[in-house]
């Protein structure tokens, strides 16, 4: 009997240890902030609001979730804020944080943050104002060829982002010197669209989800998309490939946190964001926006960002 009691006590100790190890990881108490390093509206904002909504509805986190807007410097202001914030603060990110570094526009590097997740990807498009004499992407490129430095192409929010780089890449593949393109930079997609509608620019390079509501309203038309084939929601929008330019390019969005997050804190977000991206609500939002689900956890994200950094360096240097 005595041996049985001792054995039972040993088993209980091991079970308690297992329970402690299996306990869900936690963040310090306090409200969670999701930083949008741009103006309200646009893809980062839509993504942040979707995350906030699912975290609240599904009660994935116990504390409240706030969205904080920090626009300026092509994401720089927002990422500096995250860099100095508590462990309850996370931020939207994209390839812009990589290109800012590669172009020497920022002292911040990806190593100054903790990669937490990649969430989704979507396609880039070239938009034209209603009544434009141009009809497709090739028309835009031909116009630049005929009038170098005269055709205004808008993008937002920061130099070196995917909106700008995707257009540069398509133009380069068509034989256009990037210095012959007159770019106009805007602080938000809303400002960009309004400039396009007012014919202040000849075309705008942007994500498909940002262009969609204005295309549906008939305010703009779409001249090209960077997908490999026509998209079901946009059957009349030709790909660059159809126009003789073998260019396929997707834009991704993700989440980062402050530097030096603990393994427990990283694990917390691995679990929380996995639940978010697995939820029906998230999948509905993905479909509404014509995005593609592209969830990567923290470890996969770190590896992905290393690959993307090399990819963007090759685009910018031509090597």
UniProtKB/Swiss-Prot annotation:
It comes from the Bacteria. Gene3D superfamilies: Bordetella uptake gene, domain 1, Periplasmic binding protein-like II. Keywords: Signal. It holds the Pfam family TctC. SUPFAM superfamilies: Periplasmic binding protein-like II. The keyword Signal applies. This is UPF0065 protein YflP. The gene is yflP.
């Amino acid at each position: 009997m005595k041996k049985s009691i001792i054995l039972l006590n040993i088993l209980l100790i091991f079970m308690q240890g297992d329970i402690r190890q299996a306990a869900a990881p936690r963040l310090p108490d306090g409200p969670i902030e999701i930083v949008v390093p741009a103006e309200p509206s646009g893809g980062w904002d839509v993504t942040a609001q979707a995350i906030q909504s699912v975290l609240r509805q599904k009660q994935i986190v116990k504390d409240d979730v706030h969205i904080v807007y920090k626009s300026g410097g092509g994401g720089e202001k927002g990422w500096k804020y995250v860099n100095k914030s508590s462990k309850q603060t996370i931020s939207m990110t994209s390839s812009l944080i990589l290109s800012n570094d590669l172009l020497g526009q920022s002292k911040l590097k990806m190593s100054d943050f903790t990669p937490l997740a990649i969430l989704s990807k979507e396609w880039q498009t070239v938009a034209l104002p209603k009544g434009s004499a141009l009809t497709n992407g090739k028309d835009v490129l031909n116009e630049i060829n005929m009038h170098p430095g005269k055709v205004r192409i808008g993008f937002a929010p920061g130099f070196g982002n995917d909106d700008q780089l995707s257009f540069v890449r398509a133009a380069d593949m068509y034989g256009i010197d990037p210095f012959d393109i007159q770019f106009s930079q805007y602080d938000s997609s809303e400002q960009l669209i309004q400039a396009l509608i007012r014919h202040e620019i000849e075309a705008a390079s942007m994500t498909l989800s940002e262009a969609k509501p204005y295309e549906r309203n008939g305010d703009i038309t779409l001249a090209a998309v960077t997908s490999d084939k026509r998209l079901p929601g946009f059957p009349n929008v030709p790909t660059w490939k159809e126009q003789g330019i073998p260019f396929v390019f997707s834009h991704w969005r993700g989440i980062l946190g402050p530097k030096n997050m603990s393994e427990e804190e990283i694990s917390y977000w691995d679990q929380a964001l996995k639940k978010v991206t697995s939820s029906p609500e998230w999948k509905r939002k993905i479909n509404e926006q014509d995005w593609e689900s592209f969830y990567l956890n923290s470890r996969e994200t770190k590896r992905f960002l290393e690959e993307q950094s090399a990819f963007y360096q090759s685009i910018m240097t031509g090597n």
